[in-house]
Amino acid sequence: MSQLCPCGSAVEYSLCCHPYVSGEKVAPDPEHLMRSRYCAFVMKDADYLIKTWHPSCGAAALRAELIAGFAHTEWLGLTVFEHCWQDVDNIGFVSFVARFTEGGKTGAIIERSRFLKENGQWYYIDGTRPQFGRNDPCPCGSGKKFKKCCGQ
């Protein structure tokens, strides 16, 4: 039985993010890396998350924290609403909303992630959290106001 990819692509997982998470392939661009990292959170794969963090971030030190977070967090969906990169600059950005429940409460991470390419491989380096007014349109594209959607 085929399983749709948790990244929201509407493609079978084995044909979408699995080749990246399993190490068969390297993500070709920041958007694919972002989507595969989301899948790693869903699948509780700390090794892939650490491997795809930029080496300067010292992600291995976060292993215990990541694993502890897996026990309390259920990921509900990912919406990528903006992505841009240039291989010439070796830098890229992906803006997304990741919805989750933790401790019985629903939440959302809204982030503009920054990625760096080194030696032919993209890495997550950091992200910023844009600020939205309660009456602004939600960045997830639902058409609702932020306060009635991801801002709850």
UniProtKB/Swiss-Prot annotation:
It comes from Escherichia coli O17:K52:H18 (strain UMN026 / ExPEC). It comes from the Bacteria. Gene3D superfamilies: 3.10.450.50. This is UPF0225 protein YchJ. Belongs to the UPF0225 family. The gene is ychJ. The lineage of its organism: Bacteria, Pseudomonadati, Pseudomonadota, Gammaproteobacteria, Enterobacterales. NCBIfam families: PRK01617.1, PRK01752.1.
